Every structure is written in structure tokens, then in C-alpha cells.
């Protein structure tokens, strides 16, 4: 399980700040629809007290999609552990060496192994975090999808396991 603490908080804040700068300097305009409702849900103290987590799902076309999403969120969300996302990352893509492993573990990312099924420690950790009211973000297609169509590939079984086995049914965004 990725360690929490000062190093983890520092890495998450650093990536969020760099992503925000990249979006500000590298994009003419960034528009996020529905972010106010998402932030309200994420910061709702009653939701967290009830142990009702959030599963957010997104398609992605590059490995930059996940960290760049952080740059669109308010800075205040990165001050508390309960409002910072946990994520799953493919072993063969982002955990290629010890430095990457150290960095991504401290960036609140669990290592999943393609082809090894839905009963992996990373999925177990995600279910536990959902039961504690945490936010878990996943890319349910299980790979980068370079298709120009808006059609999603099939979701993986792990998505169902997260939702069905969480102690309290999580919000799904």
C-alpha cells in the first residue's frame, strides 16, 4: 500500500502545481464542466463521515491525462488527505523501475498487474479506501485508448468489484 505522510502530500501537491502551470501556460483555454458539483461532493463532510467513497472514471489517450486533471481542481483540495484521489496504475507502464515505483506510490497510486485478474492487492486497497470515504480514480478501459471515436472500450471487471464490494455503495462519477 502506498505510504501516506509528508512525502506523499508533497508529491501530490507538486504534481498538482506543475499541472496547473502547464495548463495555464500551454493551453489557450481549459473548460471543465460540472467541477463545482464534484468539488461539493468531494468536500461534503457527511459523505466522508458515512464512509461513502467516490469512484471517478475517465477515458484517457495519454499518460499525462491523469496528472493534468489535477491541475483543474482547486488548490484547497490538496491540503487534506480525504480530498486527494487514490488511483490504480499499470505495472508495465508507470512502475518500470525503483524510482518510478517510489514516486508513484507516494503519489497515491497502487500498482496493478495486467492479466492477473480482479483479486489483486491494489483492488483490495481501493475497496478499503472507499470504505473510509476516500476518492479512488480509475481508467476503466485498462489501457490508453487512442481511438478518435467517443466510444469507450469495454470496462474491466475490477470496476464492478470496487463498486459492489465497497462497504457502502460509493458515488460513481
Regions inferred by a protein language model and the residue ranges of each:
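Eukaryotic N-terminal low-complexity, Ser/Thr- and Lys/Arg-rich leader segments
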Residues: 1-17
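N-terminal nucleotide/polyanion-binding subdomain common to many enzyme families
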Residues: 15-26
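Soluble catalytic domains of membrane acyltransferases
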Residues: 29-173
